[in-house]
Amino acid sequence: RMPCCGFLFAEKRRPNHIIREMVDFYQVPVYELNRIKNGADYVTPEGKTVSNNLLTRPSAPSRSYAYCSDTIYLPSIVEQIKGVDLLFHEATFANEDAPRAKETFHTTAAQAAEIARRAEVKKLLIGHFSARYEDENVLLQEASAIFPDTQLAKETLCVSV
């Protein structure tokens, strides 16, 4: 067997957005703006502290995506993918074929859903289905019973994160 790896893509945190009217009101010098965007309060020349939340509004939250395929059921990945916005996880077999999944180093739809549930991901996308299933909805039903926000990965599917 060859070791496989997954991928975790996570955006860097973006700086807060300056509220121009408030920066103008407090006459904040331009050289202070980067510090303020990164969370610092502003201290006026008179010594008054102006809270950062008066000068900025939060940026959109960072997004994250994890991809795990061609892998046996591996609960230890939970900590690495904790809280991702979207998880693609293989769901090669149905529960009734769990012994075959273990033998071939793959996972079942229920195992993929359990990983998603334990990792508290926002959305699960399952794929890499065995050709033995004419109707992949059986895999979707098994996964959805454990992790309701599950979707089948189909060719040309586009998912917003």
PLM regions and their residue ranges:
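Binuclear metal-ion centers of metallo-dependent hydrolases, dominated by the metallo-beta-lactamase
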Residues: 73-161
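Active-site-proximal loop/helix segment associated with metal-binding centers of metalloenzymes
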Residues: 1-67, 71-79, 86
